[in-house]
Design a protein with these regions (language model features):
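Intrinsic disorder/low-complexity detector
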Residues: 1-29, 48, 54-110, 139-174
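Amphipathic, interaction-prone secondary-structure segments
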Residues: 25-51, 108-128
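Structured beta-strand/turn binding interfaces of compact recognition modules in eukaryotic regulators
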Residues: 57, 126, 136
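Conserved catalytic cores of phosphodiester-cleaving nucleases, focusing on short active-site segments
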Residues: 133
């Protein structure tokens, strides 16, 4: 699976998830493969003006799988993005993806309560391609809330139907 194909799926899923804190979703980067000067990714803008990004990185051979855990507070945007993405994938079960897991990358992040923080999502595709999608974040012009402003958010059922929106044939001119 190509990086762009995986990012197409992720972008469609973020849009279908309709999270109320996400105000804009944009693609960026020109690289077709991880490791270049312009990594391909998706940037999500939040109500606070901060952003979180999921981008294709070269997999680290010592990346350590981590359990999903609880949703972290808004100030940890990169971590929230990873947890939200995992939760969305759990609901959507996209056919091209065989499995996904959070990973800690050696030398990235810190230790929280004796455990490393996640820094990436490892996706194993059905064609045996392994994608390593790193998460990073930027600050916004407003302070992040201390607690989740949308604690009752549930991933909508429409996420299960994402593939119908992405792969449906166009009703072009005949």
């Amino acid at each position: 699976m190509q990086v762009s194909q995986a990012l197409d799926i992720m972008e469609a899923l973020y849009r279908a998830a309709e999270h109320p804190d996400i105000t804009e979703i944009k693609r960026y980067g020109r690289d077709a493969e991880p490791g270049g000067q312009s990594p391909a990714g998706i940037r999500l803008w939040h109500e606070s003006g901060s952003s979180s990004m999921l981008w294709a990185a070269v997999p680290h051979r010592d990346a350590q799988p981590l359990p999903l855990g609880e949703m972290p507070p808004p100030r940890l945007r990169f971590w929230r993005l990873l947890v939200l993405t995992h939760q969305i994938l759990d609901v959507a079960q996209p056919e091209p993806f065989a499995s996904w897991e959070l990973c800690a990358t050696p030398g990235v992040g810190w230790t929280e309560n004796g455990h490393p923080t996640p820094s990436a999502l490892r996706i194993t595709c059905r064609d045996r391609t392994v994608l390593h999608l790193r998460a990073t974040a930027t600050s916004g012009d407003r302070r992040e809330p201390e607690t989740d402003p949308y604690p009752d958010y549930q991933i909508p059922e429409g996420v299960r139907e994402w593939h119908h929106k992405v792969s449906a044939p166009s009703a072009g001119h005949v």
